[in-house]
Amino acid sequence: RGSNLTIHPLRNIRDIFYVGNITIG
């Protein structure tokens, strides 16, 4: 996942936001 962070940073941030949404909701 480290390489993914460098290649697709927006995708990684979106994934974190998605997980955070599930945790909050």
UniProtKB/Swiss-Prot annotation:
Keyword entries, A-Z: Aspartyl protease, Glycoprotein, Hydrolase, Protease, Secreted
Free-text tissue specificity from the UniProt record: Placental cotyledons.
Top-rank taxon, per record: Eukaryota
Keyword Cell cycle: no
GO molecular function term, any single one: aspartic-type endopeptidase activity
Sites where a glycan is attached: 4, 21
Entry's Gene Ontology BP terms: proteolysis
Signal peptide: none
GO cellular component assignments: extracellular region
Protease as UniProt keyword: yes
Post-translational events: N-glycosylated.
Subcellular location: Secreted, Extracellular space
Enzyme class, broadest EC rank: hydrolase
EC number in record: 3.4.23.-
Family: Belongs to the peptidase A1 family.
Protein name: Pregnancy-associated glycoprotein 74
Species: Bison bison
